[in-house]
């Protein structure tokens, strides 16, 4: 079918042409039905599809693709990837280096077009037909039966078109062309995979003779919240009756007097169509509510509203709304929700599915919301565009505060290689040709999402510098919707219009610098719209930020970057499932694994980082002394009596006593509760208090553990004296043996053999170790360069001297190591008659910061099961112990590794605060004991992890088990991933005389 096609390269590149014939924006209606006919028909499913490299290139043969979906992701499933591949870049634009372009220009040689086509037949009784594209990346043009209908940009908000005049009886043909790049691509430089397609649902809809075009629900409250006034501002087309039912009361009005209505339909550059008028009428209904049930994340109370349209007394349309009553305001330089100072415990959330990209299923959205709720997250920033409306509906229902962010990021036009390089090309600034394009994006979001109580703040976009246009956007938000505040982080970079943002918002600022800023600039509340960069093994020091929110009233929390890794599910070269990141499809330029920076893995498995988030964001802070619990209730609206307080004592991880108490403590207050029984005084004695949710809440079941606190003391007594073992000193080796055990130390090598019950446990020689596999954060701050010596120091340490002495109950073997810089490191092995070996390594050099200080034990492959007494059940690090609970925990070495680095291998799997550990399997095992040491058991050495960039590049995971016992391992950091080191208190150092002592045993 030939198309009347007005789309040209010049049109696509022109920032002043961002829509043609697009209908006015309006609120999203989650439930709009008619008893007589369907009002909406989904066109999701299989569409005919063909592809061209650019506007002048020939199209491919017809194929079939699925809508919603991305062209490039579906192309991956076809031989040769005929429709291109996903392309990942962060700040730089995807055409950088391919074509020299400036804003107002777009790629010509490579600007792929995907042409979708399908037929449809109108349902009976439809007198009109409209098309809704809920998401088209990045621009789309529409034809019906070959007649040009319209054009739209702005990837993440709906575009609606009137196709009625082009419809004919019987079968109709709909064609949609999607363009990968347009002028709007300069405004959509978000940190994500660059792809194109119809990635959200496509729908047809009709309008009955009387129709609800729009509704805006507005609220006001008495000062003490004892009453509320709720107003429904409605726009209605056609003639008939409109009825609103709310809180048990019904109000109605007659409509039908024609009124001229600017439809917003645009032809060319802003020229309104003079022939378009509709009989749209404004009508309002106001309801009084006594003692309203207020909405909050803790108590997401929703009222049901129903708006009915009748024609000559017959119902023709019904719209359901859920209304949350809440007041959000800025008062005395603090943000208040329902009169209470709010603390945002948030995450940034890109829409993502590892198989379908930003086409996210409802099941995945529900999983996300429930997962956030059960990890004490109370807020989401929709980075950096409006989310699918269903996600916002879930936030309303389950209780999550939302920063709704405009689809705007021009990062690459001003930030060059990490520095502010703003110039005449910086967008949007005050450039008049971009003004309407930018402001329309704000209007589209506000109009669609204005009735969601979860949205507390409108954001002007992300990382788009500053200037007049952004200030005008903020003023639009305030004028149109004074019930919300306005956010924009970019004023940090450009203070020309500081009033653009109602709050100071920054990214990745250390707590110390936040304190300094607020001391000098206390004019506004402060939030971190991005902090604690979750790339790889990260999020160290996260609790510092949360604790500061309860010390400084002006600091009101922040949003972790980010919620989910953006890995793409693929089959790796070894035939196993895996995840791809930037560059894996040959995409260049690329920022490689920078898209893998989430708390949750691409397939929605939680990492141990989420354990720390849950603890840091807990609604209760529980601190224990030896005799009482001090519980700070950090809720805004929930009393402490909503929780059962479970007191449990244990010795060496074994339960002793248990009691359940309840206590009253108002939100914001603190309670002191004396232990119902004494802390034991034997072994590793521990008291644990857990706060258990008594009643179910949306997304949270009864019995949910909201918070916990612990205190423990080690009362371990001295061991019994036993006869010394036998010393066997020969020319090449020194042996120490006793009943059912034998240790052999090779001269020039060190500890080369451990046999228990006649079974060899070592796979290779035990060695000192000072190295960990670099994390993304390590690489970002050049730590491998700074510490490179310590990689070789352990690998090539030379055991120059071996001595042995039998004295008392011990045989002590000293292995004197020489490091590549010439310094010596003595390690003493004191072995008793039971086969227990006390190991002490003592630093002889000067003050030195090390990545790690300990010993590495390559064990036999059969030893795969770990049981330990320490912080668990999953990984903890020196700067991320929050969420780790003292107890006895068990794991399989290979299965444990799989949950940490399925995308980009790096250091992982450590356990801190370990007092004892056993590694067992199909052969007799080995035990380790220390005084709260760091312990890990992995299938790989740090060097093997470091050498791999994907899982398939690692050696087989069943060749050995690598145990490391450490005095310390440097913290993982996470203030950012491009220069920030871990905090000073977890950048550990040794000095002359520093020693590490632990024990191995049968």
Predicted regions and their residues:
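Extended substrate-binding grooves/exosites of carbohydrate-active enzymes
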Residues: 2-35, 70, 147, 186, ...
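Beta-strand/loop-rich accessory regions of lumenal/periplasmic or secreted enzymes
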Residues: 71-77, 83-89, 180, 296, ...
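Accessory beta-strand-rich segments of carbohydrate-active enzymes
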Residues: 2-7, 12-19, 33-34, 48-52, ...
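Short strand-edge motifs at loop-to-beta-strand transitions and within beta-strands
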Residues: 116-118, 157-161, 281-287, 669-675, ...
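Beta-strand-rich binding/interaction modules
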Residues: 144, 227-270, 283, 305, ...
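Catalytic cores of secreted or luminal carbohydrate-active enzymes
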Residues: 190-211, 566, 575-624, 634-642, ...
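An acidic-aromatic loop/edge-strand motif
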Residues: 82-106, 153-155, 163, 167-228, ...
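Short glycine/proline/serine/threonine-rich loop/turn segments at secondary-structure transition edges
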Residues: 127, 167-171, 289-302, 680-686
């Amino acid at each position: 079918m030939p198309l009347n096609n007005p789309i040209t390269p010049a049109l696509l590149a022109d920032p002043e042409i961002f829509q043609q014939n697009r209908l006015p924006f309006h609120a999203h209606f989650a439930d709009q039905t008619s008893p007589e006919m369907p009002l909406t028909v989904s066109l999701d499913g299989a569409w005919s599809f063909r592809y061209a490299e650019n506007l002048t290139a020939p199209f491919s043969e017809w194929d079939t693709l699925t809508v919603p979906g991305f062209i490039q992701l579906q192309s991956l499933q076809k031989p040769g990837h005929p429709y291109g591949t996903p392309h990942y870049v962060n700040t730089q634009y995807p055409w950088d280096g391919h074509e020299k372009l400036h804003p107002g220009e777009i790629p010509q040689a490579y600007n792929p077009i995907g042409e979708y086509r399908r037929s449809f037949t109108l349902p009976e009784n439809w007198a009109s037909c409209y098309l809704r594209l809920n998401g088209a990346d990045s621009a789309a043009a529409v034809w019906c039966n070959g007649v040009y209908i319209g054009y739209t940009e702005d990837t993440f908000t709906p575009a609606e078109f009137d196709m009625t005049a082009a419809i004919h009886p019987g079968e109709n043909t709909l064609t949609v062309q999607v363009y990968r790049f347009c002028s709007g691509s300069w405004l959509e430089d978000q940190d994500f995979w660059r792809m194109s397609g119809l990635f959200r649902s496509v729908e047809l809809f009709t309008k009955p003779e009387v129709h609800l075009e729009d509704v805006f629900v507005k609220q006001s409250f008495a000062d003490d919240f004892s009453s509320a006034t709720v107003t429904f501002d409605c726009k209605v087309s056609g003639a008939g009756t409109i009825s609103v039912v709310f809180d048990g009361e019904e109000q109605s009005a007659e409509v039908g007097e024609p009124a001229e209505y600017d439809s917003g339909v645009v032809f060319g550059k802003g020229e309104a169509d003079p022939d378009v008028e509709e009989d749209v009428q404004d009508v309002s209904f106001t309801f009084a509510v006594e003692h309203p049930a207020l909405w909050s994340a803790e108590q997401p109370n929703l009222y049901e509203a129903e708006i009915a349209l009748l024609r000559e007394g017959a119902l023709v349309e019904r719209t359901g709304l859920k209304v949350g009553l809440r007041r959000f305001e800025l008062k005395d330089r603090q943000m208040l929700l329902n009169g209470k100072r709010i603390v945002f415990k948030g995450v940034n959330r890109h829409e993502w599915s590892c198989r379908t990209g930003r086409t996210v299923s409802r099941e995945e959205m529900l999983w996300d919301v429930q997962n956030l709720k059960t990890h004490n997250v109370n807020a989401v920033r929709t980075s950096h565009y409006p989310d699918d409306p269903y996600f916002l509906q879930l936030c309303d229902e389950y209780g999550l505060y939302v920063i709704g962010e405009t689809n705007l990021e021009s990062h690459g036009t001003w930030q060059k290689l990490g520095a502010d390089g703003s110039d005449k090309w910086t967008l949007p600034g005050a450039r008049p040709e971009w003004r309407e394009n930018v402001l329309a994006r704000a209007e589209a979001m506000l109009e669609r999402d204005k009735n969601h109580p979860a949205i507390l703040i409108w954001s002007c976009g992300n990382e788009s510098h500053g200037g007049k246009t952004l200030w005008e956007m903020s003023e639009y938000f305030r004028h149109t919707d004074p019930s919300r505040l306005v956010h924009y982080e970019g004023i940090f970079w450009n203070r020309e219009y500081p009033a653009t943002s109602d709050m100071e918002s920054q990214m990745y600022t250390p707590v110390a610098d936040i304190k300094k800023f607020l001391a000098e600039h206390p004019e506004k509340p402060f939030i971190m719209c991005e902090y604690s960069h979750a790339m790889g093994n990260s999020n160290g020091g996260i609790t510092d930020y949360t604790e500061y929110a309860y010390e400084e009233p002006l600091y009101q929390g922040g949003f972790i970057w980010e919620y989910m890794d953006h890995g793409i599910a693929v089959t790796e070269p070894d035939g196993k499932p895996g995840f791809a990141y930037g560059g894996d499809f040959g995409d260049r330029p690329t920022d490689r694994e920078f898209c893998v920076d989430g708390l949750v893995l691409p397939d929605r498995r939680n990492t141990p980082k989420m354990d720390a988030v849950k603890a840091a964001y807990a609604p209760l802070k529980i601190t224990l002394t030896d005799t009482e619990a001090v519980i700070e209730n950090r809720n805004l609206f929930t009393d402490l009596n909503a929780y059962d307080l479970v007191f449990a004592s244990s010795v060496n991880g074994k339960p002793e006593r248990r009691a359940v108490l309840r206590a009253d403590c108002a939100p914001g207050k603190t309670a002191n509760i004396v232990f119902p029984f004494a802390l034991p005084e034997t072994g590793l004695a521990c008291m644990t208090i857990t706060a258990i949710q008594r009643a179910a809440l949306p997304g949270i079941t009864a019995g949910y553990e909201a918070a916990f606190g612990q205190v423990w003391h080690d009362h371990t007594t001295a061991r019994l004296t036993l006869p010394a073992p036998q010393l066997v000193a020969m020319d090449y080796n020194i042996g120490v043996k006793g009943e059912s055990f034998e240790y052999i130390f090779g001269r020039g090598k060190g500890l080369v053999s451990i046999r228990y019950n006649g079974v060899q446990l070592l796979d290779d020689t035990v060695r000192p170790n000072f190295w960990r596999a670099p994390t993304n954060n390590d690489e970002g701050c050049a730590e491998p360069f700074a510490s490179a010596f310590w990689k070789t120091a352990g690998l090539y340490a030379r055991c120059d001297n071996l001595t042995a002495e039998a004295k008392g109950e011990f045989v002590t073997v000293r292995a004197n190591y020489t490091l590549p810089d010439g310094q010596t490191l003595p390690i003493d092995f004191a072995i008793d008659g039971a086969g227990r070996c006390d190991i002490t390594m003592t630093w002889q050099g000067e003050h030195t910061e090390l990545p790690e200080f300990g010993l590495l034990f390559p064990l036999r492959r059969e030893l795969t099961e770990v049981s330990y007494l320490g912080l668990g059940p999953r990984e903890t690090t020196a700067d991320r112990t929050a969420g780790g609970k003292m107890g006895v925990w068990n794991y399989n070495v290979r299965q444990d590794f799989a949950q940490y680095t399925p995308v980009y291998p790096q250091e992982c799997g450590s356990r801190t605060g370990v007092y004892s550990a056993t590694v067992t399997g199909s052969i007799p095992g080995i035990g380790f004991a220390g005084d709260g040491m760091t312990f890990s058991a992995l299938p790989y050495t740090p060097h093997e992890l470091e050498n791999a960039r994907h899982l398939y590049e690692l050696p087989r995971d069943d060749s050995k088990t690598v145990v490391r016992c450490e005095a310390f391992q440097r913290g993982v950091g996470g203030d950012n991933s491009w220069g920030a080191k871990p905090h000073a208190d977890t950048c550990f150092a040794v000095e002359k005389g520093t020693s590490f002592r632990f024990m191995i045993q049968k």
